[in-house]
Amino acid sequence: MDIEVELIETGGRESINFFPNKRSRAFEPLYESLVENYSSLNRESIPYQRPSILYVLPNNIGNLLGTVEVLMDWKRRMGYEVNYVSSSAIVNNANNLKNYIETAYEAWDNPPEYVTIIGDAEGSYDIPTHFENWSGYNGEGDHPYATLVGNDLFPELFVGRLSFDSQSHLQTIISKTVNYESNPYMGENWFKRAALIGDPSTSGVSCIITNDNIKEVLQNHGYEDIRTVYGGDFPSQMTNNLSDGLAFFNYRGFYGVSGYTSADVGDANNGFMLPIATVITCGTGSFGTEESISEAFLRAGTASNPKAAVASIGTATLGTHTMFNNMVDMGFYNGALV
């Protein structure tokens, strides 16, 4: 049976004035997930750029630059081209910083695929973030730094933030990151272990259903020890599971994280058995004015005795909604593993 499909477009088409000269391998998994039969394309003749990272540093980085250079040197050894900017005229103004990133993306021979902001959005080592003005909550976030071409919300590169407020924070974060990638703790099978926490008391049973979905994804990808916490003393159970060492730590519940605070994060005793923490509920990613619990996960411990997590994902503002949080949560694990 033959099927013929005719596509008729209506309406105007946005004019895109820029296309990169070379394709980024970092986006290949996304294309494969979105484009039917993408794997059947012959990509041997496609020119790909060299992997590239741009670090954005506070203008007063001073003698802390040596700490950051440990991370930059490791990335170079991994094969990345590494650049950084710390000019006060650029990093102290969100619009100027976005313009700099956009110029780098469009004009550099080897543009950045990743932009890592090293600094808090407030405090002694601040680099501004963006605040949206359409929800009424003034939510902060760095995503606008990645939307460089067109009027859509799709990113042209990957952006993240290593948020620190002190020399100790920075040393801890760099130690966590470099050791996680270059010298992971191999003493036991912690990297096949996960803890999934769902509190239905306010946001409803969908928090448990979300975690059950994530559990199935993890099981399908070889995770052998998956702990679920759906009731009882949430803070103590979260601390105990973190201390055992995890690959993933996931929370779905309501504002306040079921009584688990930034101070509780520091009670974990997991050393270099550091998970990626996804704490998807109101306020967990509100880093614009004070320390959020996501920042606490990243900063906890010391360079030689780290705690909590190597990375953390949260959501900003007190105006998030259960159904959307559930989708973000399940979507992360589907995107990371599937």
What is each residue range found by the language model?
Residues 1-338:
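Cysteine-dependent hydrolase recognition
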